[in-house]
Amino acid sequence: MPKASDIKKNQAIEHNGKVYLIKDVYKSTSQGRAGGSIYRVRMYEVATGLKVDESFKADEMITLADFSRHQATFSYVDGDEYVFMDNEDYTPYNLHKDAIAEELPFVTETTEGIQVFTVNGQPVAIDLPASVDLVIVETDPSIKGASATARTKPATLSTGLVIQVPEYIASGEKIKVSTVDHKFMSRA
């Protein structure tokens, strides 16, 4: 059993008889003699999708749930469900759009490196690669000679995500975007 200090985003744990998927982990260090660090965890109950915020002491023992990852590719949308196909055995994994709302601006049919997380055989979340390639559908015209400046302009991507890009980037270009901080990285 791992300690609370070992838990990470997108792990599944059992807590108070229920299975939760961890979305965020924040470490706060106590002042003075109060003791060790406290980990504030935002997690979602797998069965109902309810958000729960919990605090754990660094040395508190945590029980991990039966959890596995599967390489998958986005296939299609079925109403409010997004269907991902397992790359090995073509098993379809249906995920409600609310469960993957944070990841959706980076998901296209050409996105590679997507992993579907399953808990007890049930799909609960996806994990994206560190960066994805997306096409700019709308931005201000590019400015010649603007590569020497660090000024940026807004650009709307093929998924609807709006990010800041350098002035020399034009509509129709494919760019690499960080899925961690939602920022322009380079041309693809």
From Swiss-Prot:
Query: PROSITE patterns, alphabetically?
Result: EFP
Q: Which domain of life is it from?
A: Bacteria
Report the InterPro entries cross-referenced here. Elong-fact-P_C, NA-bd_OB-fold, Rib_uL2_dom2, Transl_elong_fac_P/YeiP, Transl_elong_KOW-like, Transl_elong_p-like_YeiP, Transl_elong_P/YeiP_cen, Transl_elong_P/YeiP_CS
Per its record, what are the GO molecular function terms? translation elongation factor activity
Any matching Pfam family: EFP_N
Q: Which GO terms describe its cellular component?
A: cytoplasm
Stretch forming the signal peptide: none
Give the GO biological process terms.
peptide biosynthetic process
> Sorted alphabetically, which PANTHER family does this protein's record hold?
ELONGATION FACTOR P, TRANSLATION ELONGATION FACTOR KOW-LIKE DOMAIN-CONTAINING PROTEIN
State the similarity comment.
Belongs to the elongation factor P family.
* UniProt-recorded name of the protein: Elongation factor P-like protein
- Source species of the chain: Saccharophagus degradans (strain 2-40 / ATCC 43961 / DSM 17024)
Lineage of the species this protein comes from: Bacteria, Pseudomonadati, Pseudomonadota, Gammaproteobacteria, Cellvibrionales
